[in-house]
């Protein structure tokens, strides 16, 4: 974390058990939008804020005393505290959902994925999901060899990662809101790392997943002011890390193996990218 990373932030107390807000940051993802919704198992007793930035402009809204129990604060260096009455119940369950689209999207994600579920239920669901992914492979070898294999297999399933809300909405490379229709949108394409092995591997073991990744890459090109497939895309941003044209290998391999069928769409994206002097 460094000074100036947060471009703008917001926190709202919607009611005594729901917080929403967002943070726009500048970093490897040049303009990264992160919205959140936080549900609380106990009502807030009282709360307060502090803006650590010295603001020269004193607008009319500064006549309000926002340091305590004011329902909203914005700024670049804001911090907050919340007090709860835990005399009768010492347990406080905090559920957090994220969205790159909006606070409303974060609330939808929260309701869809965590509503009515305990921490133990969510943890068990995560274990079940991971086991269902990893149990497709059964190998022989020493414990160290198995640990190495399954750790590497686990790594292939972390990134690229899903980048959309439960309703299919996502923030595109043009920073507009789009709807993924008929595919799952992905981000985090470190293609100079993954074109050699991960994407060819996914074509063999998870072809549907890699087809969605290819479609996500093509949508990236269609939303690009340069008309380019990803170089190294991250959270709706192109960070331009590494030279070379690695995306073409990913698309060509998926087409050759029959994983991706929209050849005309893919070819148009590949030709467009190849004509950009990068």
Q: What do the PLM-derived regions correspond to, one by one?
A:
Residues 144-145, 184-193, 239-247:
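Secondary-structure capping and boundary motifs in well-ordered enzyme cores
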Residues 20-27, 196, 200-201, 213-216, ...:
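Short, hydrophobic/aromatic alpha-helical segments in well-folded domains
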Residues 170-174, 178-179, 209-259, 263, ...:
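Helix-terminus loop motifs that line ligand-binding clefts
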Residues 105-107, 162-169, 200-203, 211-214, ...:
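Short, solvent-exposed loop/turn and secondary-structure capping segments
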Residues 1, 151-164, 187-210, 252-258:
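Alpha-helical support elements that line or immediately flank enzyme active sites
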Residues 106, 129-133, 193-194, 228-230, ...:
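Short acidic (Asp/Glu) and glycine-rich catalytic loops that position anionic groups and cofactors
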Residues 134-141, 204, 258-263:
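Inter-helical turn/loop segments and adjacent helix faces that build the functional surface
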Residues 1-186, 219:
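Beta-sandwich/jelly-roll carbohydrate-recognition scaffolds of carbohydrate-active enzymes
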